A protein has these predicted regions:
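A juxtamembrane structural motif centered on a specific transmembrane helix
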Residues: 1-3, 378-424
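Cytosolic juxtamembrane amphipathic/interface segments immediately preceding
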Residues: 1-9, 47
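Helix-boundary and loop/linker segments of multi-pass membrane transporters
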Residues: 8-10, 148-149, 311-314, 356-357
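N-terminal export and membrane-targeting signals
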Residues: 11-15
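Hydrophobic alpha-helical transmembrane segments of multi-pass inner membrane proteins, especially
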Residues: 17-25, 29-32, 39-281, 327-384, ...
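Gly/Ser/Thr-rich beta-alpha loop segments that engage phosphate groups in nucleotides
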Residues: 29, 103, 108, 172, ...
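Interfacial segments of multi-pass membrane proteins
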Residues: 173, 178-192, 308-330, 393-394, ...
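TM-adjacent membrane-interface loops and short helices in multi-pass inner/ER membrane proteins
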Residues: 271-319, 330-334
């Protein structure tokens, strides 16, 4: 019996496994709640989230647990050697999505596999983390860090661009956010870091100037201030030119990027800055989500008793806005407990990154930490109205087999690293 239990339990840090199990149980409890029958006259005009959603997720949980066990037991060298083949296979799958993937709500994000639908972009995150850890880990000594950084940027951009064309803006941003986390841990040059941060600021200011204020002067003023700072710093002409050129390119690129966004994506971003413009349209999700979380208070309305959820005011309550259900029914204490579990998982990943001896393993652990950090922070920020709605799930919690399986792969990699943390 003990031997059988050992085979059905993943190797590695038991604390990570317990955190994973608690998060999955949390998910199933919330999904059971959102699949309860709706009540009220308004709800009769809405569609229930069927109980099959819960039972499908149970099946995915079983498959994900098996995946967790397998990945935690694989040789670390094998994972490193397979990073390129896995990455290339995922790129092929992403290309297939655009060619033969079924179109749902104007986008192609899935591949039909019998009765199931898989979302290759979710597995692309795992593949990219593996490959970036391999690429950067083999370039920690000798050679140019700038060259290694630019090469890693290309490896992250390829799947990000393919996903953006589906279109799926939220998921494409995950690739870049994880890349930033890993490249920061790797040791990005100060020049590249300043260039990236200032260019990001330039893009945001240009968007706000053009789309919200409809005045060009804030962005022009920003460029003048930047040029003054560069002059006072007395840096090299090449470095100053790189920073200024990147800022101008980022700002001028915003109108081009905006033109390629889908109309619903544009509406969501505009509604974020001005919710009163369309309270019952594009801003509806964010408004109802904030109402749900706010009505929960400290202790919540109690499990299965959420009114925003039960009356169907809260859309996408089983997927992107499941955190709102936790906030409404379980209150600040319940939602806070959920966030603490994620925090413990991320902190453990960072601990592993500092304990392991191989650069590949350290970068891989940081990739896992970056993945969960970005997903959780952005999803919670969306549900609380701090960011525009982008359709990013809460890992291990939201309904969806592909995301659950991909997130379980990430946890499996972390467990594997905890086993081999003292290997050379």
């Amino acid at each position: 019996m003990i031997r059988l239990f050992g085979l059905l339990w993943p190797r590695g840090d038991r604390r990570v496994t317990v955190i994973y199990a608690l998060l999955v149980v949390f998910s199933l409890a919330l999904l059971w709640s959102v699949t309860e029958p709706l009540v009220g006259s308004y709800a009769r005009m809405r569609v229930d989230v069927p109980k099959t959603v819960f039972w499908r997720q149970v099946i995915w949980v079983v498959l994900s647990w098996g995946t967790l066990i397998v990945v935690s037991r694989l040789p670390l060298r094998y994972l490193e050697n397979m990073s390129w083949p896995i990455y290339l296979v995922v790129l092929v799958l992403l290309a297939m999505v655009m060619l033969i993937g079924p179109e749902v709500a104007g986008s192609r994000r899935w591949l039909a596999v019998g009765p199931m639908r898989l979302q290759p972009s979710e597995f692309g995150k795992v593949a990219m983390v593996l490959l970036l850890a391999t690429w950067l880990g083999r370039r920690t000594e000798g050679g140019s860090r700038i060259t290694a950084t630019l090469g890693s940027l290309v490896l992250a951009l390829v799947p990000a661009v393919l996903v953006l064309r589906e279109p799926d803006l939220g998921t494409s941003l995950v690739f870049m956010a994880v890349w930033l986390g890993m490249i920061f841990w790797y040791g990005i040059s100060t020049l590249l870091l300043l260039t990236a941060l200032s260019a990001s600021a330039s893009a945001v200011i240009m968007f706000y100037s053009e789309r919200i204020l409809e005045q060009p002067w804030p962005w022009a003023g920003y460029l003048l201030v930047l040029m003054g700072i560069l002059y006072l710093l007395r840096g090299s002409v090449g470095a100053s030119g790189l920073i200024l050129g990147a800022n101008i390119a980022a700002g001028l690129g915003i109108p081009l990027v905006w033109a390629r966004l889908e109309p619903y994506q544009q509406d969501r971003i505009i509604s974020f800055f001005d919710p009163s413009r369309d309270e019952f349209g594009t801003a509806y999700q964010a408004i109802q989500s904030k109402v749900a979380i706010g009505s929960g208070g400290l202790f919540g309305t109690h499990y299965l008793q959420g009114t925003q959820k039960g009356l169907a005011f809260l859309p996408e309550r089983h997927s992107d806005f499941v955190f709102s259900v936790a906030g409404e029914e379980l209150g600040l204490l319940g939602a806070g407990t959920l966030l603490v579990l994620f925090l413990l998982l991320v902190l453990r990943a960072v601990d592993v990154a500092t304990e392991v001896r191989r650069p590949f393993a350290s970068l891989l652990a940081i990739g896992v930490a970056s993945y969960f950090t970005f997903h959780v922070v952005v999803n919670v920020a969306i549900t609380t109205g701090l960011l525009p709605v982008t359709g990013l799930p809460l890992p291990l919690i939201s309904y969806g087999g592909s995301n659950l399986l991909a997130s379980s792969l990430m946890v499996g990699l972390l467990l594997n690293l905890s086993v081999h943390r003292y290997d050379d």
